[in-house]
Amino acid sequence: MHLIFGGYAQGRLSYALKTYHKNRADVFDCATQPLSEWNGQTILYHLEALVSQSLQQNKAPLTLLQETVPNWQDCILITQEVGCGLVPISAEDRKWREAVGRMNAQLAAQAETVERIFCGLSMQLRKCPFQSRPPDAAANTGRQNKNPAEHPIEYY
């Protein structure tokens, strides 16, 4: 499972489509479709909308999450970052914001990769093992065992 989060209009979906070589047919938009219509699409977009739907039905969002996450292990989950803006005035909006924050934290704890998108750029918070360089990659760069003091230019 891969988690991508970021603020409004920061390029989360565009980044996911480009980086993971997907197209619009691979996207399930949780803001416009009920979760019951999910048909195995690889990208689940606007995951924060599931929190709104759960709260409107008087269901615990984290319970829904626990029930559905096992089905999403091979998916890319895209959600909105909350908590960096103003605290909402209404109690209902504050409840939604807290629930989305808790959902994001639980998803991040379970995801193989976690990326924050800001201005269309990715900040990797957790990197998937298959994305890292193989152990012998350092041998191919000619950089192993170099002392930074002896080669200061290469380290800037």
Task: Identify the residue ranges that each predicted region occupies.
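Glycine-rich P-loop/Walker A and Walker A-like loops and their local beta1-loop-alpha1 context
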Residues: 1-32
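Conserved nucleotide-sensing/catalytic segment adjacent to the nucleotide-binding pocket
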Residues: 25-27, 35-77
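Short, solvent-exposed loop/turn segments at secondary-structure junctions
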Residues: 10, 49-50, 83, 122
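A short acidic, often aromatic-flanked loop/helix-cap motif at beta-alpha or helix-coil junctions
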Residues: 33-37, 122-124
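Short, intrinsically disordered, mixed-charge
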Residues: 21-22, 56, 105
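A short secondary-structure junction signal
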Residues: 15, 55-56, 128
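Generic hydrophobic/packing signal
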Residues: 5, 20, 45-48, 86
